[in-house]
Structures are given as structure tokens and as C-alpha cells.
């Protein structure tokens, strides 16, 4: 990929993206036909009169057709007090400070669950730290607990001899599996409705409350048991 040296106008060029990316109509007609119009585009709200418009203007002029079916207009990222970030105000946040401390996934999770994607998001460094501690440390501790004891027991998830059918599992195991199934279905339904923030909050509530605070705490002694049993294998699986 090389940068195009000849640019007539940045908005005209960006508006041609739906077909220019394939060098259509000069070649790749099959690739163009397979992807036009695209299912979804996403940019910040300021692109309403920018890229969103230029794409549609060029497409309707050239093809008499839309070039995208859905559009998500993202809200801007503001400081923790809801004010526009500005170097002159000294309220700009360097993302690398948090990449190096809490990790990129913590920032992604915080930004996803903080507010609806189409709404402005107030970026609070304390919120990133809270997401890291609440969601990711919890996940890590749950994994570490299971992995340590599974390693001591030589547990192999692919071993059919230690697999326990659902109907033979304890009420606690069937409860957490039911909660996980319900959460997954609700997660999918919210994604279909573009309620990504609500889906993320539901997943976090499941991990922290149902899985860690309730299920794992009540299952520790089952894994501490040095004797192999149906109940222990059920918990390991």
C-alpha cells in the first residue's frame, strides 16, 4: 500500500473510498460487488457533515445508490468534568500513561461501558483504574485460582473420562451455567441493538458478582479436596 500522490480534494477522495479502495471500475469488480454497499461505518459526530456526507454524496452521484447501510456516530471524549480537552487548559490526558499502567484493554473496557457510544464520554483516570481492578484483576484471580489447582491435579479439559454430564452436576454448577447462558443471550441481543455499553455492564456484573463473588467462593473447597470425585471434576469442567 502506498500513499496516493495526486489528491484533487480530500473530501472528494474520501468520498470515493467505497470503490477507490478496490481500484474499481478499472479492476476488482467482483470485490466491489461483494462489498457494496458496506454494512456499517463508524466515526465521530463531527463527520456528519464530513466523511458521512461525502461518501453518500459521491455514491448517489456516481451509482445512484447508498454506499453504507448503517452509520454509528460516536460522541466526543471529554475530560472528567465534561469539558473539551485542551492543551491550553491543561486537561489533556496522555493515553500512554494508562497503557503503561492499566493496559490497553482496561481503557477499551472503560470506554465501552462508561456511556452509550453515541453520547459524549467523560474520561476519568480513576474510572480506568477501577475498570482494571474490578474487571481484569477479578478475571485474572479467577483464572489463576483454577489454573493453579488444575495444574496440581494434572487436569486435562480434553479428557472425556473426567467430563461430567449436565444432569449429574451440582445445583451450584447448573446455576452458574444457566446464568452464563442467559448473560450470553442478553449480551448478543444488546449488541444487535447497538447497546454495547449495556452488554459490557452485564458481562462485568456476571464476572464480578455471579462468577467470582458467588460461584468461586462457594467452590473453593471442592478444588482444595485432594481426592478425585465427581463433584471436583464437575467444578473443574
Tell where the protein language model's regions lie, with residue ranges.
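Acidic, turn-prone loop/beta-hairpin segments
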Residues: 153-185, 217-237
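Structured secondary-structure scaffolds
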Residues: 1-152, 176-219, 223-224
Amino acid at each position: 500500500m502506498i500513499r496516493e500522490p495526486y489528491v484533487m480534494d480530500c473530501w472528494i477522495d474520501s468520498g470515493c473510498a467505497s470503490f477507490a479502495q478496490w481500484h474499481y471500475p478499472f479492476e476488482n469488480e467482483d470485490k466491489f460487488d461483494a462489498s457494496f454497499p458496506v454494512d456499517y461505518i463508524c466515526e465521530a459526530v463531527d463527520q456528519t457533515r464530513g466523511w458521512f456526507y461525502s461518501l453518500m454524496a459521491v455514491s448517489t452521484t456516481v451509482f445512484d445508490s447508498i454506499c453504507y447501510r448503517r452509520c454509528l456516530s460516536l460522541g466526543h471524549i471529554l475530560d472528567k468534568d465534561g469539558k473539551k480537552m485542551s492543551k491550553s487548559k491543561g486537561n489533556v490526558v496522555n493515553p500512554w500513561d494508562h497503557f503503561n499502567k492499566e493496559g490497553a484493554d482496561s481503557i477499551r473496557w472503560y470506554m465501552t461501558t462508561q456511556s452509550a457510544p453515541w453520547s459524549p464520554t467523560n474520561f476519568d483516570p480513576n474510572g480506568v483504574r477501577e475498570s482494571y481492578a474490578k474487571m481484569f484483576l477479578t478475571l485474572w484471580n479467577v483464572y489463576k485460582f483454577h489454573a493453579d489447582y488444575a495444574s496440581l491435579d494434572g487436569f486435562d479439559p480434553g479428557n472425556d473420562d473426567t467430563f461430567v454430564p449436565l444432569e449429574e452436576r451440582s445445583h451450584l454448577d447448573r446455576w452458574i451455567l444457566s446464568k452464563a447462558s442467559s448473560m450470553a443471550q442478553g449480551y448478543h441481543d444488546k449488541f444487535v441493538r447497538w447497546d454495547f455499553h449495556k452488554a459490557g455492564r452485564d458481562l462485568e456484573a456476571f464476572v464480578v458478582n455471579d462468577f467470582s463473588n458467588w460461584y468461586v467462593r462457594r467452590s473453593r473447597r471442592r478444588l482444595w479436596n485432594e481426592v478425585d470425585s465427581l463433584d471436583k471434576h464437575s467444578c473443574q469442567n
